[in-house]
UniProtKB/Swiss-Prot annotation:
Keywords: Developmental protein, Differentiation, Lipid-binding, Membrane, Oogenesis, Receptor, Steroid-binding, Transmembrane, Transmembrane helix. It is a multi-pass membrane protein. Its main location: membrane. The lineage of its organism: Eukaryota, Metazoa, Chordata, Craniata, Vertebrata. This is Membrane progestin receptor gamma-B. Belongs to the ADIPOR family. The chain crosses the membrane at residues 53-73, 82-102, 115-135, 139-159, 202-222, 236-256, 315-335. Residues 74-81, 136-138, 223-235, 336-347 are extracellular.
Amino acid sequence: MLSLIKLQRVFNVHQVPKAFHEDGIISGYRHPRSSATECVWSLFQLTNETLNVWTHFLPTWYFLWKLMTVLLMEDVWNEAYTWPLLVFLFSCCVYPLASSCAHTFSSMSTRARHICYFFDYGALSFYSLGSAISYSAYVFPDAWLSSSFHAYYISVAVFNTVLSTSLACYSRLGLPLLHYSHDIVERFSERQCPRMSKVLRILAFAYPYLFDNIPLFYRLFVCVGEGCTDNEANSVHVQHTLLAFLTSFLFATHLPERLAPGRFDYIGHSHQLFHVCAIIGTHFQMKAIEMDMGLRRSQLLASAPAISFNNTIGAALLCVSVSLGIICVYSLPLLYSSNPKNTANKE
């Protein structure tokens, strides 16, 4: 099969539009006007995006297997206690799949690149909500069960998801309806303000993560005495937390390629490492959640607020609907703005 694949030409950073540039990456860029077929074939040759795709596409199947196992082994239709885990596992399938698709098809055009990453951001925001829903059901420390914070936790997490998707999309192109019929380049763009775009994007995902983990951080690092939920899952939660901060560090710093531009273009650059750390961290997060779910089942069913459709699947459906609406609002100006060829050339 590989012998039938026509290898695509790769380009250096000076041969592609600035919208496609990555910090510290000098070579290995695909053609910025690739067809969908060429994008797929490019996954079977080494470019600076190849491992970005595979490091998320392959783990998607692992998380899908975990999801299907729960669906087949548990009485999910009648057992509401499993619903938060289902939402979390589904979000674990969605975010790496959306990421791998974004990295695959982002070289079709400037517009396609933006839209692909809009969906990527929406999927990451949905994953943050999936984490919050599972934390509310299984991870909250005993001392905080049925507290006022617990009562509003999911509602705030839903709002954070909407805010995260909006801010992340804004970080690429600014307000979506500003200069609706004008070229993209006339609006705020990542190309014009790369540092501000990076700060906004980090904020868009750091804030929901920090909020989601308030009960976990309190449980692990602050709480002493009774009501602190000290069990075997805590050490696994710590592993996930360390990997989450390492993931954030790699995403924010672009190390090691910033120290040696061109050395890590194909293998070993920060985005690949960031993907690997994120997936391993998600694995430990899933393991810790499943441990808490089993170890604390009787206590949570007796003391925690009742798990309902509204605070699990309903919240997830609302998040998906609103995020898709936000993505559409940000994407429409790209699809209908004037002079598409000129816009692509300027970008």
